[in-house]
Amino acid sequence: MSDNAAFKFGSFDYICEHAALVVCPMLGDQQGMAPTCYSRNVQLGSQIIFQPATCILHIAALVMATIMLLHVRSKYTAVGRKEIVLFFYMYIWVELFAIFLDSAIIPTANKVYPWFAAIYAGSVGALYWCLLLNGFVGFQFHEDGTPMSLWFLRISSLVVGAVCFGIPVATFKGTSSSMSPTNTVGLFITYLVFPCVCVLIYFISQMLLVVRTLDDRWVIGDLLFMAGFYIAGVLLLVTFSVTICDAVKHYVDGVFFSTLAFLFAVMMVYKYWDSITKEDLEFSVGSKQAVWDVKDPLLATGMEYYEDDAQSAYRGAGGSLVGGYNGNQYYGNQPGYAQSAYGQQGYGQYGAGGGYGQGHY
């Protein structure tokens, strides 16, 4: 790697000179590529931990991603719930790998490091592809949450991940003249260009979705913050990393701030999704109380209802729907039907003396 290398498409010379990327130790000559300034190391026993501040940030990202994942899973009827859950699972997977690779818990000289770095690169590609497809869920080209939607997302992400895994392996091993540690165009496209394209398409698709279908324009702010954090993370990583590292005396570098910016971008993705999805309370199993508003005037405040009003029609206090009499008025407040029904109404004038013989007949 030449000193003060200029940026060139397809080349990692400039980028690896400024930032400690996972793939840089496998590129270039026999010694790999290393940044001109990187954060201090910490020794824990016999283990040297590289990028300690960044590792702590990765752990914090795992905690935050878990919290967001649990919140997403609690919205049982939200649109695109299962699809965005897969995105957060993949983000957690990527962060787990980043802890072991950024910290050099898996040493760069170890024979398995190229394979883990390739798995990490493939997982990153699959993660951004999953984000891109989540951007089209809101357009309802096919129903979300169905086996077709989920399996298409899973299989396509697996295919993209396999491609983004195979290209680094071929590059690290130098399987051909077009893919070698010194010819990195394919890796440059899959590892750096492809994620940026996915974020751009996601941003444009969501802006169209908000403008065309939603009344709430406040969610545009979430998208703008997401894009801003992502762009800031890229710039901090590939442009200002050395400047930051020198300014803070090697305590942190651009990798730390770019990881933080990417975490904020993921949090904005969650915030945006949470803002545009509404839960159907009829099928919600949440623990919130008094979520229903009483609209029926019969149940409104001021209308008293007593359990005693539900008595039998023969002894109750309420009026009958027939003739305007209640049970006590109609049956003379007597305990039985046979004893009072004919004695209180028209038949009583004939039956009081014991039979029909004393009547008008």
Curated annotation (Swiss-Prot):
GO terms for biological process: cell wall organization; chitin biosynthetic process; protein folding; protein transport. It is a multi-pass membrane protein. One of its GO terms (cellular component) is endoplasmic reticulum membrane. Belongs to the CHS7 family. The gene is CHS7. Interacts with CHS3. This is Chitin synthase export chaperone. It comes from Cryptococcus neoformans var. neoformans serotype D (strain JEC21 / ATCC MYA-565) (Filobasidiella neoformans). The chain crosses the membrane at residues 48-68, 86-106, 119-139, 150-170, 184-204, 218-238, 250-270.
